[in-house]
Amino acid sequence: MASTSYSANALVTALKKPRDKFTKEDIKKYIFDNGIRHLNFMYAGGDGRLKTLNFVINDADYLDEILSCGERVDGSSLFSYIEASSSDLYVVPKFSSAFMDPFAELPTLCLLCSFFNKDGQPLESSPEYTLHKACEAFKKETGMEFQAMGELEYYVIADDMGEFPAVDQRGYHESAPFAKFNEFRQQCMLYIAQAGGQIKYGHSEVGNFTQDGKLYEQNEIEFLPCPAEDAANQLTIAKWIIRNLGAQLGLDVTFAPKITVGKAGSGLHIHMRIMKDGNNQMLKNGVISETARRAIAGMMKLAPSITAFGNQNPTSYLRLVPHQEAPTNVCWGDRNRSVLVRVPLGWASKTDLCKIANPNEKGTSYDTHQKQTVEMRSPDASANVYLLMAGLCVACRYGLSLKDGLKVAEQTYVNVNIHKKENAKLLSKLDTLPDSCWASADCLAKQRKVYEEFGVFSPAMIDGIMAQLKAFKDKTLRAQVTKSKTAMQKLVKTYFYCG
């Protein structure tokens, strides 16, 4: 059970219970006790952004009605693959998601919602329910739980005042005054935590440059591992908060995968771990486990088509080029940032680091094996987070079912920087990621049956994603725009506020 001690979420503190135990009566009590008159239903549309439906609480009966029944919405305006002739959907609030809107002048309670069809059944093709189905299939087929967390990268843009300039492309973990937006990031982190986000840390990132009188500073907020459905909710809310606070303070914010040539693009790396009975299955005897290697094998197999969920506009493929802090080839390795799937440091040495650093300590007994994850490095924030998490969950389940999974993992493992000249022969043997949305759609077409297995992704949704990717007509676009600064700027402007 999640701890309620020192929670940043106002409802957890007031109700003295974890969010996953909230009931309708709890929500009503908090609203009445705090004199709240406004309620927002929020839900991610097909573009992955949060949509909002506002309510004013007329009386207690009306509050009970909307909490119990939800409300109608036009599904064809939210999802491109829903026909206008039969588009009515229900949105029904999830009480565990409750948080106070940090931007509303009038006290407003927000609730994330699930979609239901006319028959009162979950909408099969909604991204949120697709992720739910993926997690349920994973649990049913493996007896384990799929958990995840994201590293959310973004650029903050403001006028360049010329004071304490940071070194170009050397902004990683920089401090003030060379990093200009630490306070903005801290305020974002607080609001995200108050909305239920479980944050690991935040810091400035590599990207830091000036252009045309503007300062571009890259930042990252990283979360803690949790059930994948919660992880997707947290990332979706986080993007909404970062954008809103930026707008409030007069700062421009972009999650775009690439905003100029030669500078670090922004990714959305996803860390994963597999749990059973509350125990992390990614390590065994201090080394990466067979379970982890099999899950990685699934990602190696499905890597080309995972881009269909994780890299959803043409600028995504301007980021996936060599020497730009982004992967290009299908491989994995330990502590290796040139690979697609990285196994980061996981505190596997069993050394009491705290005692060594602090001689006055008697020793700690923290179970560090719970911390090990594996990281998929190709996605970016153009992704619909729910579909991306669902795709990764499917890939890990698929890997666990492969008879030759361990062999696949062995064949795709590398322990060198694959982009160095001396490793050119090795690089030539590795499969490459798609170079366009068009190519990504082709990869999805070839591998779609894996995603449709167990009814996780609906055929209509796969068709819709492929059509959306093909519509960009970007088969040769990467080669074209890299030769033209004007074409590059036009493309970046088009997708500047993606995701």
Regions found by a protein language model. Name each.
Residues 13, 162, 166, 212, ...:
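Membrane-targeting and insertion segments and their boundary/processing signals
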Residues 224, 370-376, 419-428:
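Short, local alpha-helical segments
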Residues 112, 151-165, 207-222, 256-278:
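Histidine-centered divalent-metal-coordination microenvironment in nucleic-acid enzymes
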Residues 323-325, 414-422, 466-475:
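Eukaryote-specific, cytoplasm-facing alpha-helical/coiled-coil scaffolding segments in long proteins
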Residues 17, 25-32, 37-47, 51-119, ...:
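Active-site capping/gating regions of soluble enzymes
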Residues 224, 275, 344, 486-488:
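Generic beta-structure capping elements
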Residues 1-208, 226-240, 251, 387-388, ...:
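ATP/Mg2+-dependent ligation/transfer catalytic cores
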Residues 407-437:
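Intrinsically disordered, low-complexity charged/polar segments
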